[in-house]
Amino acid sequence: MIEELHQEVSDRGFLLTSADKLVNWGRSMSMWPMTFGLACCAVEMMNAGASRYDLDRFGVVFRGSPRQSDVIIVAGTLTNKMAPALRKVYDQMPEPRYVISMGSCANGGGYYHYSYSVVRGCDRILPVDVYIPGCPPTAEAVMYGIMQLQKKINREGQVYSGWRKRV
């Protein structure tokens, strides 16, 4: 009975899917990241956006304004002086918002881990969704991290589950 109804509706040209899947697909295939390049990892992020790797084919369009972005890519060494600025930029982004931590320095302090002026991982300031390892990570690793975030967005259960309150 259900299969017959599904076939009849499909034959008439209607699309049957849940709103969650449709909205999550749209979100995952049109990510607009805000770049927060702090060190040498930013060069690899620019390389990933150039013509050889072309992140545009994944729906990734880099934005210069946090109000137009839904993803922030933190690339490089985060210092104590820069941490409040990063948090302010993150707070200006509309919900749902996601964070990618790119490189060893952003993930855990990296080479400068024991320095008094370095934050030992941007996850102490922001809730990180995807970590991209490497020093600096390759453009392929950046692409893989973006694809992992797309998978994570597609797995979200409800339309509003991405609008979770973050501290």
UniProtKB/Swiss-Prot annotation:
One of its GO terms (molecular function) is iron ion binding. [4Fe-4S] cluster binds at residues 40-41, 105, 135. It is an enzyme of class 7 (translocase). Keywords: 4Fe-4S, Cell inner membrane, Cell membrane, Iron, Iron-sulfur, Membrane, Metal-binding, NAD, Quinone, Translocase, Transport, Ubiquinone. Binds 1 [4Fe-4S] cluster. GO terms for cellular component: plasma membrane; respiratory chain complex I. The keyword NAD applies. Its main location: membrane. It comes from the Bacteria. Its EC number is 7.1.1.-. It is found in: Cell inner membrane. PANTHER family: NADH DEHYDROGENASE, NADH DEHYDROGENASE [UBIQUINONE] IRON-SULFUR PROTEIN 7, MITOCHONDRIAL. Belongs to the complex I 20 kDa subunit family. NCBIfam families: nuoB_fam (TIGR01957), PRK06411.1 (NF005012). This is NADH-quinone oxidoreductase subunit B. The gene is nuoB.
